[in-house]
Amino acid sequence: MKRICLLALITTMSGCAMLEPIETDEVTQATTVVDAVEGDKSKDESSGIVDTLRGRNDPVAGDPAWAPIHPKQKPEHYAAATGSLFSPEHITDLYDDSKPRGIGDIITVTLDETTSATKSANADLSKTNEAQMDPLQVGGEELKVGGKYNFSYDLNNTNTFAGDSSAKQSNSISGYITVEVIEVLANGNLVIRGEKWMTLNTGDEYIRLSGTIRPDDINFDNTIASNRVSNARIQYSGTGLSQDMQEPGFLARFFNVAL
């Protein structure tokens, strides 16, 4: 009986030891924990042949790769009582802007992207060849073969080509998105990342942005223009029925490729 009780005690203590949390850094913790989002379909199974025929995988809200950063709470340090109300631990510079400097700080990016490209080409080619020879004469008379054909020819050849091509493309996006600082580089630059989801009737629309910024480019109101973001990745699209109706079906894509 004593052996059974001892074995049960050892098993219980081993299980409790396995429940201890594993310490991870802030970035790793943020990218492995998915926030609870209403309507999150990240764990839903694929609909099989439907997704295959659609030819794409729609992004979902709560993707671990876009999870927000949750910095750990720093331990409090109690200073010795000096009788003064001033605390150097909570000092704030009167002339310093409260710009984001650490992991988890937020910043608003002003989306103002406009791109336009135009290309045109014209080509005109023309070539003309002419060759003539008067009839041969011998003794003042034309030399003929069989009394019918003389030795003369007249050749004309003209080649022309005209080509015209043009291409034009333009894109524009404007709006706002608030993102978080996920990493502080050695030179002081900040790596930012964030997304915004909007549910509209039968579908969702999302904006995703990531890149690197300089703290000096941040405005006094904690905003920065999107054209100041280095290595910017901006995604604006949607999911659902409205998005599906904008794309050709499986058979249409098949015949377009086959033909």
Swiss-Prot record:
Residues 38-63 are annotated as: Disordered. A lipid is attached at residue 16 (N-palmitoyl cysteine). GO terms for biological process: bacterial-type flagellum-dependent cell motility. Keywords: Bacterial flagellum, Cell outer membrane, Lipoprotein, Membrane, Palmitate, Signal. It holds the Pfam family FlgH. It is a lipid-anchor. A lipid is attached at residue 16 (S-diacylglycerol cysteine). PROSITE patterns: PROKAR_LIPOPROTEIN. Its main location: membrane. GO terms for cellular component: bacterial-type flagellum basal body, distal rod, L ring; cell outer membrane. It is found in: Cell outer membrane; Bacterial flagellum basal body. GO terms for molecular function: cytoskeletal motor activity. Residues 1-15 form the signal peptide. Disulfide bonds: none annotated. It comes from the Bacteria. InterPro entries: Flag_Lring. The keyword Aminoacyl-tRNA synthetase does not apply. The basal body constitutes a major portion of the flagellar organelle and consists of four rings (L,P,S, and M) mounted on a central rod. Assembles around the rod to form the L-ring and probably protects the motor/basal body from shearing forces during rotation. Belongs to the FlgH family. PANTHER family: FLAGELLAR L-RING PROTEIN. This is Flagellar L-ring protein 1. The gene is flgH1.
